[in-house]
Amino acid sequence: VATNGGFGSMRHLAGRFFGALVPIGPPAADESWAVNHLLEGEQGLWRRMSGPDRRHAVGVARDTIALLGPDQSRREVVAAALLHDVGKVESSFGTFARVWITFAAMFVGRSRLIRWAGTPSDDRRPSWRARVGLYLTHDRLGAQLLERAGSQVLTVSWAAEHHLAPELWTVDATIGDALKAADGD
């Protein structure tokens, strides 16, 4: 399946879009299951994620466990699956803005759009333009949030690396392959 400048396959993007149209989180049992796999600091980040993002993340985590088997599915691997997109909370964009930004970045280039967005100022609320940059750098921002929350190295690394080519991963290739496949990229 073809990819688009680090944004994953069109199938992945379409699935995320249609899944996000239903603005609810995972069922209570899945929510509890997820929280039980997270450290205390990670739980606060989890709760900041949108309902559709949490629902998607539970699916990624369960698929990762199915691919790796229970012996290789340590807590930090499950946390990496659950929180790989946590940096998106910093932009506070909804579904339609995310779609627009993703397509814009695919057409003009992610790095070009990040340069256009600039660096957020110290204002209380970043401008819409700055929030575009926050969304497009959610991998880096997520890693920073997770590091501050006390996450384990693998969880932090996967958030930072989940859009990179496999040869650039510091995460074990078997684990990275399972996380990537489970995410549908």
Give short role names for the model-derived ranges.
Residues V1-L45, A165-A173, D185:
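Non-catalytic interface/linker regions that flank or bridge core catalytic/transmembrane domains
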Residues Q43-D185:
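Divalent metal-dependent catalytic cores for phosphoryl transfer on phosphate-bearing substrates
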